[in-house]
Amino acid sequence: MTILTHTLGFPRVGLRRELKKAQESYWAGNSTREALLAVGRELRARHWEQQKQAGIDLLPVGDFAWYDHVLTTSLLLGNVPARHQNNDGSVDIDTLFRIGRGRAPTGEPAAAAEMTKWFNTNYHYIVPEFSKGQQFRLTWTQLLEEVDEALALGHKIKPVLLGPVTYLWLGKVKGEPFDRLTLLKDILPVYQHVLAELAKRGIEWVQIDEPALVLELPQAWLDAFKPAYDALAGQVKLLLTTYFEGVTPNLDTIIALPVQGLHVDLIHGKDDVAELHQRLPVDWLLSAGLINGRNVWRADLTEKYAQINALVGKRALWVASSCSLLHSPIDLSVETRLDTEVKSWFAFALQKCGELALLRDALNSGETAALEEWSAPIQARRHSRRVHNAAVEKRLAAITAQDSQRENPYEVRAEAQRARFKLPAWPTTTIGSFPQTTEIRGLRLDFKKGNLDANNYRTGIAEHIKQAIIEQERLGLDVLVHGEAERNDMVEYFGEHLDGFVFTQNGWVQSYGSRCVKPPVVIGDISRPAPITVEWAKYAQSLTDKPVKGMLTGPVTILCWSFPREDVTRETIAKQIALALRDEVADLEAAGIGIIQIDEPALREGLPLRRSDWDAYLEWGVEAFRINAAVAKDETQIHTHMCYCEFNDIMDSIAALDADVITIETSRSDMELLESFEAFDYPNEIGPGVYDIHSPNVPSVEWIEALLKKAAQRIPAQRLWVNPDCGLKTRGWPETRAALANMVKAAHNLRQAK
C-alpha cells in the first residue's frame, strides 16, 4: 500500500496577485471577459504544475474560484437570488459577481449577498440564500470544465466539491421561515449529476468537503448525512473531507456513511490516530492532515513521522495538508528580505507540498535522514534569542484584575463624555479608513522602495490626512477620522511597529473576492518600542475643532489576522499585544485624543468551532480587550468595531468588553443583528452600519433613514450612532462622498423629525 500525497486546495490569487488585478481590471471596464478567463486558465495550469513538481501525487481541481468557492457551489446548483438573475435565466460570470459584490459589467446592480467568515478563518464566503419551494439545477459547469482542462494537461487529479449538508448549513433562509434542511432532497440530484459526469471522465476519487462534521451539530443535521450519502454513493470513490477541528465526537455518524475514505485535520483536531484506525472501516483510506494549511511554519517532520508511522502497511494511507492551502502564502523562495535564520523557520504552500513529499518518501522507505535535516531549523528555533523577551514575560505575569477595569461604570463615563463632546442626536462618523487612492499607494510604495525620503513621505501623508479632514468637515460628519493614509493594512501596520513580528514581501492570502491581505508573522514575544499612531492622530486633531478618533486594531484581531506562534498559547499572544497597545491608549489620551477606537472585528471569528470550548476563549479575549482599554480616563470615549458577526450567542461577552460605543456591520442583514442587542438590553451606545461598503452601490437617503428607523425600534435613539458598515479603504472617492452625504442627510432628517 504505497502512500500518496495530496492537497485539499491551493492558493488561487497567484504569486503576484494576478487574479486580483485581472478581476479589478474587468470590473472597472478596462479589460474583457476573455482576458479575465485567460488569467484564470493560466493560473490553474501554473498551480497544478507547481504542485506536481513539488511532489503532489493527486492534484486538487475545483478549488479555484472567481470570487469564493461557496458562491461557486451556489451557481453550480442554480441557486441565484432573483435580484441577481439574468433576464433570460442564464448564469454567467457576471451573475456570480453581482451576487458577490452587488454589481458587474453587465446586468442591473442589486444588493450583494451577505458575506461572513469561513468557519474560524480570515477567509470570507458568500452566504447562500434559500427560499421555500426553491428549485435547483446544474447551471454552472466550471468544475467540469476545469477537470477537462487538467486532464488535457495529463494530470492525475482529485476533483473537489463542497458537500451538500455543509452547503445547506452555511446558508440562510430568506423570506418565509422554513427548515432549510428540507432542501437536501432537492439539491442531491444535482450532486448526483455532477458525480456521474466525473465518473464519465474516468475520475477515481472525489474530495467531498463536509467541514460541518467537526461542529456540534443538531441531531437532525447529523441524521441527514446517511440518506444524503446513500444517494451519492456508487459512482466514484468519495473522500469525505473535514478540517479545522477533530471528528471524534461525530465519528459514529461518519463511519456509517457509504464513502471510501476520510480526511482528518491532525493539526487543529484532537483526534487520536490509533483510535481513528481502530474505529474506521478496515477498507477505508485515511487521509492524514499532518501539514498545517493555515500557518507559515516549517513542520517538524520527525514528529509527523512518529505520529503516523504506526499505521503504515495497516491501512490505505495518504498524507495531506490539514486544510486547503488557500490560507497560506504561495512560495517562500521569492522572499529575499527575510533574515536567513527566520526564513529557515517558515514554509509556504509550495514548501508545504515539498514537506508532504518528504514525509511520503520517508513513510514509504523507512529512511528518515531527510526528515531530520529538514526539521533541524525549527527545532533550533526553540532556543533562539529572537523568540524570548524576559521583560515582556515579567510584565505579563504581573497583570492584576485592576488592569482590566475602567475607573467607573458606563453610566458615569457617559455623563463625562457627553459634557466633553456635546454631540448632537444621531451622531455621524465613519469606521476609520478612507479610500486608498493610487496616489496614496504610490506614496507608500515609493517610500518603501527608497525612492522617496522620509521628509517628503511625511509631507505627502500629511496632505492626504488634511484632505480627509476637509472632506469630512465639508460633508458635515460629527466625529472625524484621519483616514489611515499611512496604513497599508490594519494589522500589518501595527505589526510593523511592534517587536516580535516579521513581514513578508509576497505573503498574500485571499480574504474575499479580490481582497488579499499580507498577514504579519508572530515570531516571538511582543512589545512596543515607541508610540505608533500618536503623531498622525495629533496632527489630524490640530486641523479641526471636531473630535478626531484615534484608531487602533485590537489585540484579538491582530492575533487572528496574523500567523501566530505555535510554541505559546493564543491567550499569551493576545495579552502581550494588549499590554503593548495599552501604552498606546495612554499616549493618545495624553496627546489630547478624546475618542479612541479599538477595532475587534475578529473577536467572534476566533471562537473555537465547538461551543463547549467557547467560554475559555471569550474569557481571555475579553480580558485582552479590557487590558488594552482600561487605562483610559472616564472622559475618554472608547469605541470598538465588529463586522461579519452573529452576536446573539456571545452578547454577554460583547457587553463585558465595556466599550462606550460599539459599531457593527448590519446593513446586509437588514438590521436583524440588532435583535441580539435588544433582547440582551445592551446598555451602551451602538452604531449599526447603515450601508454596505463592500459594494460600490450608493444608498439613498430614504434607504438609510428606513434602516435607522428600524434600528430605533430596537435601540433607544439617544444611544444610536450613524456610520457605514466598515472602513472605506476599498472604495473610490466619488461613491464615498455620495454615500456619506446621504448618510449625513438622513441623520439630519431624523434630528429634525424629533
Curated annotation (Swiss-Prot):
Which SUPFAM superfamilies has this protein been placed in?
A: UROD/MetE-like (SSF51726)
Q: State the UniProt keywords alphabetically.
A: Amino-acid biosynthesis, Metal-binding, Methionine biosynthesis, Methyltransferase, Repeat, Transferase, Zinc
Biological process terms from the Gene Ontology for this record are: methionine biosynthetic process; methylation
What's the cofactor? Zn(2+)
**For binding 5-methyltetrahydropteroyltri-L-glutamate, which residues are annotated in this chain's numbering?**
17-20, 117, 515-516, 561, 605
**Residues holding L-homocysteine:** 431-433, 484, 599
Pathway terms, separated by semicolons: Amino-acid biosynthesis; L-methionine biosynthesis via de novo pathway; L-methionine from L-homocysteine (MetE route): step 1/1
> What's the top EC group for this one?
transferase
Positions of the catalytic residues: 694
Residues binding Zn(2+), per UniProt: 641, 643, 665, 726
Q: Which reaction does it catalyse?
A: 5-methyltetrahydropteroyltri-L-glutamate + L-homocysteine = tetrahydropteroyltri-L-glutamate + L-methionine
- Per the record, the domain of life is Bacteria
GO molecular function of the protein, one example? 5-methyltetrahydropteroyltriglutamate-homocysteine S-methyltransferase activity
EC code: 2.1.1.14
Cofactor binding: number and manner = Binds 1 zinc ion per subunit.
* UniProt cross-references to InterPro entries, sorted A to Z: Cbl-indep_Met_Synth_N (IPR013215), Cobalamin-indep_Met_synthase (IPR006276), Met_Synth_C/arc (IPR002629), UROD/MetE-like_sf (IPR038071)
Q: Which family does it belong to?
A: Belongs to the vitamin-B12 independent methionine synthase family.
Its biological purpose is as follows:
Catalyzes the transfer of a methyl group from 5-methyltetrahydrofolate to homocysteine resulting in methionine formation.
What is the official name of this protein in its record?
A: 5-methyltetrahydropteroyltriglutamate--homocysteine methyltransferase
| Organism, scientific name | Salmonella agona (strain SL483)
Gene name, Swiss-Prot/TrEMBL: metE
